[in-house]
Amino acid sequence: MKRRTAECFSSETFHVSRFTSHESLVGRRGALSYEFERAGPRTILTCSSCTSPWHHFPPSYLDDSGCAYTWLVNPSGGLVGGDHVSVEAQLHAGTHVLMTSPSANRVYRSLSEPAVQEVHLSVGPAARLEWLPEVTIPFAGSRVRQSIHVDLAPGATAVVWDAIASGRVAMRERWAFAAVENEICIRTPLGGSVVERYCLVPGRLSESVGLVRSWDYVASLFVIGDAVDADVWKRLDVVLAAILEQRPGLVLGAVSTPAAPGLVVKFVARSAPDLTETLEAIWAAVREDLWNLPVPNLRRY
């Protein structure tokens, strides 16, 4: 896994390798690593490690599907400038893992260095990954750089969610962060990729925010995998589009078909409840159509 990480996060990905020696001494260096295997009907954790600020929790089993529900916990409450944290997970053949977080990912004000978070997830043959962290909240003056890279083996399916708030909305702090850079890259077995990149610098480049400025939440959901029939994708496309139309004026979005097998949902929302309710409806539809599984109530645990 160490070798894969070095290859995945090369100098062209947000130019991480260009950090100076001074910057390397600032902030925390935290790493969280998981390895999952199939044991009978269940997915089990076979290997793990973590360093501060990450805290390790073993997976839970909330239903009889065998899915390993795994929480990513940062007890420090967020990231500060100079922090460089990473998450790695290897899902072996036939496993099913859901990775989420118990609270929002807060990014605090920084004078110069960004907070960096790198995620690399490898999904084995016929494995299922659900990446559903809570929203990222960049505080005023914060700088954050995130990359999420997912590698899919034949028959693997990934559901990848990413959402960002305009700031501390309850404090009337909107689009006041210094910079947010984000990259999501999902690689398919045949060598294709689904990639989303953006850089938001509200103070210098108002056009980098554009029409999104009047909304408080921006979200993306990727559902990618070659194990799903084309008819299922078509049906799910219609269902997801209908969900986005249920909150006119509160949610605005669309469903698109990428070059890889799957769907991409992009939407903006007025409030946190609008964001959460839309995600839960979309997630429920995806689980039902792809795997005939209900959505667990993660908030109870």
Model segments located where?
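A structural signal for small-residue-enriched, beta-sheet-centric alpha/beta enzyme cores
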Residues: D162-Y301
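N-terminal, charged/glycine-rich beta-strand/loop interface patches
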Residues: C8, E12, F19-T136, A140, ...
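Short, contiguous, pocket-lining structural segments
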Residues: G81, L111-E113, A140-S142, A153, ...
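Acidic (Asp/Glu-rich), glycine- and aromatic
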Residues: F139-S147, L152-A178
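A short, polar/proline- and glycine-enriched secondary-structure boundary/capping micro-motif
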Residues: W54-P58, Y108-E113, G141-R143, V169-E173, ...
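Short, structured patches in soluble enzyme cores that scaffold and shape functional sites
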Residues: L91-A93, S101-S103, V123-P125, P133-V135, ...
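Broad gene-expression machinery/nucleic-acid interaction feature
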Residues: R29-S33, C67-A68, H84-S86, V116-E118, ...
